[in-house]
Structure formats: C-alpha cells, structure tokens
Amino acid sequence: MPIGVPKVPFRSPGEGDTSWVDIYNRLYRERLFFLGQEVDTEISNQLISLMIYLSIEKDTKDLYLFINSPGGWVISGMAIYDTMQFVRPDVQTICMGLAASIASFILVGGAITKRIAFPHARVMIHQPASSFYEAQTGEFILEAEELLKLRETITRVYVQRTGKPIWVISEDMERDVFMSATEAQAYGIVDLVAVQ
C-alpha cells in the first residue's frame, strides 16, 4: 500500500501556527533538492526553477542537490549544469546511491570543494548515446554531428572540473566507467567522501 508523499510540520519564521506541508516542500524551503529519477525535461525544469527562485530569494546561502539517478536526457542534464553555474549561491552536490551518465555530469558541476559522495555511492561516466536505429540516413548524419559536439562539450567540462588530461577523459568516455566513491574522489569528480 503506497503511503504517498509524507507530510511534515513547518512553521514560517515569525508565525505562531504550524502548518503541515509535504516533505519535498519542507526540504525545498531548507534549500535541499533531490534528483532521484531519470533526468528528463520535467525534472530539469523543476530543479532549474527552484534554483533560480531560491537564488533570487537569498543569493548568499548554499543550495544542496542530492543525486541518485541513472542519467537520462543529455540536453536536460546540461540545462541543470548550466543553471548551477549561473546562480549566485554555491550548489553543493551530494551523490547518494548512483550518479550515472548525465547525472555524473551534474555531480561534477557542483561548487569545487563542495562535491560529496556517500561512502557506498557509485559514479559512472560514458559518452552520450543516441537512437540512431530510428533515424533515416540524412537524420543519422545530422544526429551524429550533434552528438559529436555534445561529446566534445561534456569532455571539456570534465577536463576543466576534474583536472584530468583530455586524453584520459576521452579514453574513459569510450565505455561505461564505474567508480566507487573513493575512486570518484581520486578522479576529481567529487572532492570529499562522507564518513560513516
């Protein structure tokens, strides 16, 4: 039996009465976000709007993005990454569970020195994928060119944010490379591994 979204008590500063809000709204008010699903346009737009709203509300208090995602749509993930770089507050990224594919790209986009992985978290990087089998020949060529541009952009960001040479990133993106939390720290994707 599903329990739905739990409700928790919340009292706004200066108000005497406590109201019950769903847990996600309560966490958003504390500047905590969760990417706990495949990255798509809907979750991307939700996270972007929350980051922008809260950065306007208070631009000096950090935002926290908890990630447990298998990846998803590249463009939607890049939009989240770009917003993280655009907003004034630092965005701390915390990997819990899995940050794979474009989710690892979002993870590496956190504020330098403020990217964390839980001890048993896993990180996976690889090159962007496509649905070539559905395309006609002309579309296939255009899609391949676009995919190559996206791969170059993603590679440059990983190089910049991890400090790894371009040849290492390019080689590792040829296949699925899974890392433990400590391996992701050594690689430069995260800065700290949370202690148990």
From Swiss-Prot:
Mostly expressed in leaves. Also detected in stems, and to a lower extent, in roots (at protein level). The active site is at S101 (nucleophile), H126. InterPro entries: ClpP (IPR001907), ClpP/crotonase-like_dom_sf (IPR029045), ClpP/TepA (IPR023562), ClpP_His_AS (IPR033135). One of its GO terms (molecular function) is ATP-dependent peptidase activity. It is found in: Plastid, Chloroplast stroma. The keyword Plastid applies. One of its GO terms (cellular component) is endopeptidase Clp complex. GO terms for biological process: protein quality control for misfolded or incompletely synthesized proteins. Keywords: Chloroplast, Hydrolase, Plastid, Protease, Serine protease. Its EC number is 3.4.21.92. It catalyses: Hydrolysis of proteins to small peptides in the presence of ATP and magnesium. alpha-casein is the usual test substrate. In the absence of ATP, only oligopeptides shorter than five residues are hydrolyzed (such as succinyl-Leu-Tyr-|-NHMec, and Leu-Tyr-Leu-|-Tyr-Trp, in which cleavage of the -Tyr-|-Leu- and -Tyr-|-Trp bonds also occurs). Induction: Repressed in darkness. Slightly induced by high light stress and during cold acclimation (at protein level). Pfam families: CLP_protease. It is an enzyme of class 3 (hydrolase). Cleaves peptides in various proteins in a process that requires ATP hydrolysis. Has a chymotrypsin-like activity. Plays a major role in the degradation of misfolded proteins. HAMAP family: ClpP. Component of the chloroplastic Clp protease core complex which consist of at least 16 proteins: CLPP4 (3 copies), CLPP5 (3 copies), CLPR4 (2 copies), ClpP1 (1 copy), CLPP6 (1 copy), CLPR2 (1 copy), CLPT1 (1 copy), CLPT2 (1 copy) and 3 copies of CLPP3 and/or CLPR1 and/or CLPR3. The core complex is organized in two heptameric rings, one containing CLPP3,4,5,6 in a 1:2:3:1 ratio and the other CLPP1 and CLPR1,2,3,4 in a 3:1:1:1:1 ratio. Belongs to the peptidase S14 family. This is Chloroplastic ATP-dependent Clp protease proteolytic subunit 1. It comes from Arabidopsis thaliana (Mouse-ear cress).
